[in-house]
Amino acid sequence: MADRLTQLQDTVNQQAEHFCNAIGVIQQTSLPSKFVNFERIGPQTPIPCPPQEDYAQLFAQLIARCAKDIDTLIESLPNEDSSIELQNSSLKRLEIENQGTARDLEEVVQKGELLLEKMQYSLECIAQAQLDMQITLKHDLQ
């Protein structure tokens, strides 16, 4: 549960980052507004900065994707309606399933160890046979 909450917090933080970045790009690329009774100091016509990319589309996609991720994570959290009995029965079921899987794993490990022993014995036999052949060849060549 804490893992999902951490993911949710990270995603919410990422969404906040997207909003801040979008506002920053808007500030950089937009033209300043004129206010009544306010004299501007400096150049009267600001030089517009042409946007390099379609930032509106990019940030819209990022924000929408992040919102979907947040919804998915929220949906994956457990309900408050689930009773303690229901949670306990789920835990018991998972524990029984885990025990069965552990037994299966032990059997597979035992079979693997037997196969390993057989393979090691076979490799020893092959190595011994090769040594015997080399000795025989040396005696035959002499």
Curated annotation (Swiss-Prot):
Name of the protein in question: Mediator of RNA polymerase II transcription subunit 21
GO biological process: positive regulation of DNA-templated transcription; regulation of transcription by RNA polymerase II
GO cellular component annotations of the record: mediator complex; nucleus
Subunit structure: Component of the Mediator complex, which includes at least MED4, MED6, MED14, MED17, MED18, MED20, MED21, MED23, MED24, MED27, MED30 and MED31. Also interacts with MED7 and MED10.
Cystine residue pairs: none
GO molecular function: transcription coregulator activity
Source lineage: Eukaryota, Metazoa, Ecdysozoa, Arthropoda, Hexapoda
Record flagged with keyword Transcription: yes
Top-level taxon in the UniProt lineage: Eukaryota
Keyword Flavoprotein belongs to the record: no
Keywords: Activator, Coiled coil, Nucleus, Transcription, Transcription regulation
Job description of the protein: Component of the Mediator complex, a coactivator involved in the regulated transcription of nearly all RNA polymerase II-dependent genes. Mediator functions as a bridge to convey information from gene-specific regulatory proteins to the basal RNA polymerase II transcription machinery. Mediator is recruited to promoters by direct interactions with regulatory proteins and serves as a scaffold for the assembly of a functional preinitiation complex with RNA polymerase II and the general transcription factors. Required for activated transcription of the MtnA, MtnB and MtnD genes.
Localization: Nucleus
Parts forming coiled coils: 87-111
